[in-house]
Regions:
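Conserved ABC ATPase "signature" region
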Residues: 33, 37, 44-62
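ABC ATPase "signature
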Residues: 150-151
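Conserved catalytic motifs of ABC-family nucleotide-binding domains
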Residues: 87
């Protein structure tokens, strides 16, 4: 056995914010405190960050309600708050704006931009190409377990919208519903 100094990382390498059932029998505030404790944050830091996140995400009035009583959008926001409370180097998000109202969506976009401006990296999985275009610098187009393109957004898009480029890359359905003539009203 050797002696020496053990250094503990203060910032987690990455945190994922998956679409999953959280500890929904805790209140939003309790859940944030729990997540902060998991990352060994001190109590003052936990309280400061939790209150700041609750306020920024418009969850203060619901902070003491059980998460199981939250709407889908509120649950998405508390999940994001739990992931970001430890200030990870990399944040992995699945459909970060799904189920949130437009105002909350704008707030989440601002929080993510601020996170990136502060040196963090955000990895987003989304089927909403407009969201990806508005938030991402680099993209990877993956379909059917195959990587079709990766690189800077402009390089992958090649002057087209990401939606059109995605369909082009993955060989989208050429039919596009033309056979549904009964949908036409006379």
């Amino acid at each position: 056995m050797t002696s020496g100094l053990i250094r503990r990382r203060r910032r987690p390498r990455w945190v994922s914010c998956p679409t999953m059932k959280t500890f929904d029998r805790l209140s939003g505030r309790e859940l944030l405190r729990f997540c902060g404790m998991l990352h060994r944050l001190d109590e003052a830091t936990i309280n400061e960050r939790a209150e700041g996140l609750l306020d920024a995400l418009s969850l203060t009035s619901a902070a003491d309600l059980l998460v199981c009583d939250y709407s889908a959008g509120m649950t998405k926001k508390i999940d994001l708050a739990c992931a970001i409370i430890a200030d990870p180097a990399v944040l992995v998000l699945d459909e970060p704006l799904e189920s949130v109202d437009p105002l909350s969506g704008q707030t989440i976009r601002s929080i993510l931009r601020r996170f990136v401006d502060g040196g963090g990296t955000v990895v987003i999985s989304s089927h909403v190409m407009e969201l990806v275009e508005s938030l991402c610098d680099s993209v990877a187009v993956i379909a059917g377990g195959r990587l079709h393109a990766i690189g800077a957004l402009d390089d992958v898009c090649q002057g087209k919208s990401l939606q059109n480029r995605f369909v082009e890359l993955v060989g989208g359905n050429a039919n596009m519903g033309e056979g549904l003539t009964w949908l036409r009203r006379s």
